[in-house]
Amino acid sequence: MADFLLGVNYWPRRSAMYMWERFDLGEIREDMARIKGLGLGIVRFFLSWDTFAPSIDTIDTRALGDFEAMLGAIGDAGLQAMPTLFCGHMSGVNWLPAWSLDPATPHGRFRTIAGGAASPYGIGDFYAGERLLAAQELFARRVGERARDHPALYAWDLGNEFSNLREPRAPADAAAWSSRLTSALHETSEAPVTAGTHGEDLERDRHLRPSSIARPWAFATMHGYPVYSAFSRGRLDADVVPFLMQVMQSCSDKRVLFSELGNPTCPPDTVSPYDRVPLPGEPPLPAGALPPNAAAYACLTEAEMADYAYAVIDRVHARGGLGALWWCWADYDAALATLPPFDRAQHELHFGIVRNDGSLKPVAQALQRMASEQRSVLPAPPAIVSEAAYYASLPSGIEHDYRRYCQRQTTG
């Protein structure tokens, strides 16, 4: 059987989502060596759409050169790479080229940043609008030409939680988008293709169907966090992630790489006041009577995080996952705290396996321990839901399905 993949999602701790504007190959090479030193095998990283495509018919040559250098740094460290295109949605913000925006579309619950400034507009219909589809094909072809079949290239990811940019009008639009961009990448690269679906795609009907959107993919992916999941039993709930994985596996009939999992870490000497982080557009949680050392957001202590990481990845492996990629490599430099997305989401500074001074957290040792076990992918278990019935039951049905799932895990 194939090796069970372990890796991280990557932004540098000194620049975070501003990596391509402040590209520091030395820092990247240092980080890749440390990731490899932990025994991890794969790095997922993100191409800023605004940086790479300054106009609708132009792909920036300097950015393409930096992309090649990034692939080289990953490969030189003995790691595999999973580039994510059209980014797009990231950490509660939609980072978009100005030319992709539609003045008739308000930005919705996620704010838009275009050209470094906030915009009141959201993206046009990138699933079905010919103008935006052609621009995405150009991006895919040009990036694919640069990478081709680079020895470090594990797979392409079509987008990070792309439904947060805009929901498709119908599942057929999302399926056609997926097929068209997969074909564009395969013109120059034989690497597998997937795309970053996430928990909210399974919590309500967002006009995506795994069976159709995942049809051209080599495997499906899923993202999930107990602090963001409305059906979670709490911030330490280690069954949320494997449940989402098995629902995706059941509906798509594809094996699943869990390409984002994690939780925010509590600042030193604080405890979590809540079990959930409200999503953009949701009301704040009631303050109530909080302990004097309460953090400002739902979080896990460093010790809790290490235990959670091992437990949740163990479940992903046991229930047929292809692997798990932790979100994320590093806590970010405090100097970034006043910039988007952190100015409105301080918890986003604290998801890393290394602190913002570069020192390792206990969760890094937990991942290293898991990697040292050199596990292989296990056979997929039977389906736990049928796609048609599952989507017909949303949004309320997920609570029932999850409780039943947890009971089965307890009783065997």
Q: PLM features: what roles do these ranges have?
A:
Residues 108-115, 119-123, 271-299:
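A solvent-exposed, charged loop/short amphipathic helix patch at secondary-structure junctions
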Residues 133, 289-292, 343-347:
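Short acidic (Asp/Glu) and glycine-rich catalytic loops that position anionic groups and cofactors
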Residues 215-239, 280-295, 354-389, 410-411:
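Glycan-recognition surfaces
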